Amino acid sequence: MVPSVHIIGCGLIGTSIALSLRKSGYKVSAEDINADHVAQARDLGVLATLSEPQFGETSGQRAEVVFICVPPGVAAETINVAFGKFDGALILDVSSVRRSIIDELDRELTDSGRVMGAHPMAGREVSGPSSARADLFQDRIWVLTQGSEASRVTAAMVITDMGGALVTMEPADHDRAVALVSHVPQLVSSALAAQLIDAAQSDLAISGSGLGDTIRIAGSDPNLWSDILQGNATEISRVLRQVSNELAELSTALEDKNRVRIEQTLRAGNEGRARIPGKHGSGTNRFESVNVMISDQPGALAELFAGVGVLDINLEDVRIEHVMGRPSGIVQLFVPIGESEELESGLYQRGFDTRGRQ
């Protein structure tokens, strides 16, 4: 029998959890202090209520699992109150920082075994319940910290029912890891995007997918991310100093026309990128791609995907780049090595405007 679930915080993550678990047959309720968030969550079919001054009072049920989906700056306070309001419930905090929150919790909570960190390594560059998706956590890692063995079993069941994969870490190890793989990338993306504010429009007009890929996450919520970054300041500062030193040395190498040092950085980047796990946890995936020009109109992309489906070739990834000044776009279809020629030939024979392989 699945446990009843209550969610405190109806933002992107909280509402996505509600949608996912409801789809899996869970009884789910939610609350938020933001009336707009409550209304948007309700529009999506979530049983959401406006929080009273002491949140938890309006839940209308005795939840067995409570997700804390609030900004890190108020997570500890929310956990402390929820711990008393939902007697015996497993409390899962989705915050992307751990140590700073643990330090603020009452000792009774940290010793109880029923308060856990459950950080989903998933999200979007847009926020709010209107951006929520039931499949947001499909095949995404959730990092579990703390908790008793019984709590871990329950957490694992709920998370796997959302399609998630589990990794267990100590809180300090979690904070060190996310500083490198999540928090600093956000800052680097934002810092680069900030350079575009005073750029000439004619310069921006020639930008391509490289810039777009690099600054995609710069569209994230500044208020939420300020909370996150302050909560993991020590680890983030350490990584930022390393990146800053690398950039300073690279700048000097460029001024000195030191080709060896420049190549050293580029090759180190290749090596680091290759260490990122690929599909199913294997080494970095290497794909071939086929470029296809399609018109910018309803149904064009669906028609292309249908054409690929007829060929019985598995797409590993898709990227779309709009063509400036034309109502069309280039779709880059990524497939396993050795299958791009068959894909290009098959699509061409079916009348698609193929534009070469890579």
Q: Can you annotate each of these PLM segments?
A:
Residues 1-53, 57-60, 65:
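NAD(P)+-binding Rossmann beta1-loop-alpha1 motif at the extreme N-terminus of oxidoreductases
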Residues 5, 28, 166, 315, ...:
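Hydrophobic anchor at the start of a short beta-strand
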Residues 35-36, 96, 149:
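Helix N-cap at the beta1-alpha1 junction of Rossmann-like dinucleotide-binding domains, i.e.
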Residues 54-92:
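Rossmann-like NAD(P)-binding element
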Residues 78-130:
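Rossmann-like NAD(P)(H) cofactor-binding subdomain of soluble oxidoreductases
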Residues 136-219:
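Internal alpha-helical scaffold of NAD(P)-dependent oxidoreductase catalytic cores
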Residues 200-270, 289-290, 297:
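Interdomain hinge/lid region at the active-site interface
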Residues 272-358:
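A conserved regulatory-domain signal marking ACT and ACT-like small-molecule sensing domains
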